[in-house]
Amino acid sequence: MKITRWTAEMSPKKEILIQLIQAEGLDYTEVEIRSGLKLTNHRTQMREFIQIIEGELIFNLSGTQFALRPGDKLELPPNTLFSYNNLKSDVCTFLSSKTI
């Protein structure tokens, strides 16, 4: 697992995040997670990337919890068990990409 935190002074723009993903040769899917929604015990089949556009997700990997915020990128290796939930009152939107 690798987390890359967004450190630029400006907030990330969706178009910029898409360009960064495409520069890596990846396709993406845009995902919206409503407030209160939870995904439990999901296992990656391939290498998976998640990059937050807006909102916040709380991830749980092997009992370790951490927050992902706008611009943050999470890289998960194949066969990784994880869960996440949106504890905020706003929708969380992220880009999901997968590769072998």
Model regions: which residues?
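Short, conserved beta-strand element in jelly-roll/cupin
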Residues: I33, T44-F59
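Short acidic-glycine-tyrosine-enriched beta hairpin
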Residues: G63-N79
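Structural motif
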Residues: E56-I58, Q65, L81, V91
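Conserved short histidine dyad/triad with adjacent acidic residue
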Residues: K14, D27-T44, P78
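Ligand-binding loop in jelly-roll beta-barrel domains
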Residues: N79-I100
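Short histidine-centered beta-strand/loop micro-motifs
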Residues: I18-L20, K38-T44, N85-L87
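A short, N-terminal "cap"/entry segment at the start of jelly-roll beta-barrel domains
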Residues: M1-E30
